[in-house]
């Protein structure tokens, strides 16, 4: 039996200025889809995401944390990459979404049209910026048990995700996260502040719930035609209701369970369609030893995207008997 292909889509924290720029310059399918989606964003809200994303004054090292731009930019880059892969004959047998990446997974699997998915992302960014106070998200490289054992973490943050045995993310108010960072620094526990201005997957976004649910109720949601595995539940979704797209903002991210669910069915080839290769890095820690060859990333801050894309195409389409 052919090895199934699984596309993985990551969320906030994986973005950076100039992401996908090499593909935009050299891959016609990626560029055209990005332009089409940007036209939709301009028509919907009056501003170009691409102009912000690829502005020459915005350096790779600058934090890309303006939600009105970073939210749609992540979706656009992920969906355009999935489209470019499909145009080369590389089509997913499953999709896995994580946090904001659930929208790209939903669009690729047919749950939402690409335009509706982008509209949901744009509206979510607008509502969150208008109704929610700022917050922070912090990745911690340590045993997730630390969250329960350290009173400072448990009392002043919420657990946003456990990504693998030594990596988890918390959300909280900015001043609380700063205190936690000081404490972690004293204890020499590695950590990284994510380029996110709001505390997703925590009570800090609760003010957005009702207006966003009213907006979601207007959307046409379909049954996926490609199996869709969600990190909101850690399993396959078949009967998706509108409120699901609020849950992916508010509930903890269960990517580890989602990946294990997928791999327990059949050992797949996992292609990270996110901007940073974040989920590919997580997958190498989650799946059994010897699985690294089944895990690929294309976009990274170090570029070489065309090379990575060609390597994947060669490995998938070249062997005899592999379906196109």
UniProtKB/Swiss-Prot annotation:
Can you tell me which residues form the catalytic site? 99
InterPro entries assigned to the protein according to its UniProt record, in alphabetical order: Ac_transferase_dom_sf (IPR001227), Acyl_transferase_dom (IPR014043), Acyl_Trfase/lysoPLipase (IPR016035), Malonyl_transacylase_ACP-bd (IPR016036), Polyketide_Synthase (IPR050444)
Please verify whether the record's keywords include Acyltransferase. yes
A cellular component term from Gene Ontology for this protein is: cytoplasm
- Tell me the route in metabolism or biology where this protein functions: Antibiotic biosynthesis; bacillaene biosynthesis
Keyword Transcription regulation set for record: no
Class of the enzyme per the UniProt entry, highest EC level? transferase
Report the principal subcellular site.
cytoplasm
Family annotation (Pfam families): Acyl_transf_1
The compartments listed are: Cytoplasm
Supply the name of the protein. Answer: Polyketide biosynthesis acyltransferase homolog BaeD
């Amino acid at each position: 039996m052919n090895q199934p292909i699984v596309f993985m889509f990551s969320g906030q924290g994986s973005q950076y200025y100039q992401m996908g720029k090499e593909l935009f310059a050299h891959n016609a399918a990626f560029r055209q889809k990005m332009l089409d989606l940007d036209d939709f964003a301009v028509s919907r809200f009056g501003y170009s995401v691409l102009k912000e994303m690829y502005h020459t004054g915005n350096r790779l090292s600058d934090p890309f944390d303006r939600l009105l731009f970073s939210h749609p930019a992540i979706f656009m880059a992920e969906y355009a990459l999935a489209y470019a892969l499909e145009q080369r004959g590389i089509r997913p047998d499953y999709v896995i979404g994580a946090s904001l990446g659930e929208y790209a997974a939903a669009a690729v699997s047919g749950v939402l049209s690409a335009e509706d998915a982008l509209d949901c992302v744009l509206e979510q960014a607008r509502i969150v910026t208008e109704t929610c106070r700022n917050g922070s998200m912090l990745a911690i490289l340590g045993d997730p048990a630390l969250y329960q054992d350290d009173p400072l973490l448990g009392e002043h943050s919420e657990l946003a995700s456990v990504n693998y045995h030594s990596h988890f993310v918390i959300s909280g108010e900015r001043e609380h996260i700063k205190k936690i960072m000081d404490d972690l620094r004293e204890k020499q526990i590695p950590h990284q502040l994510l380029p996110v201005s709001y505390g997703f997957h925590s009570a800090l976004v609760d003010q957005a719930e009702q207006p966003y649910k009213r907006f979601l109720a207007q959307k046409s949601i379909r049954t996926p035609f490609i199996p869709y595995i969600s990190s909101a539940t850690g399993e396959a979704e078949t009967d998706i209701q509108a409120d699901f797209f609020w849950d992916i903002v508010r509930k903890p991210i269960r990517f580890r369970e989602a990946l294990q669910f997928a791999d327990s069915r059949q050992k797949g080839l996992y292609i990270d369609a996110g901007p940073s290769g974040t989920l590919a890095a997580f997958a190498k820690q989650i799946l059994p030893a010897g699985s690294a060859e089944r895990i690929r990333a294309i976009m990274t801050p170090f570029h070489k995207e065309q090379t990575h894309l060609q390597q994947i195409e060669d490995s998938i389409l070249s062997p005899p008997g592999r379906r196109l």
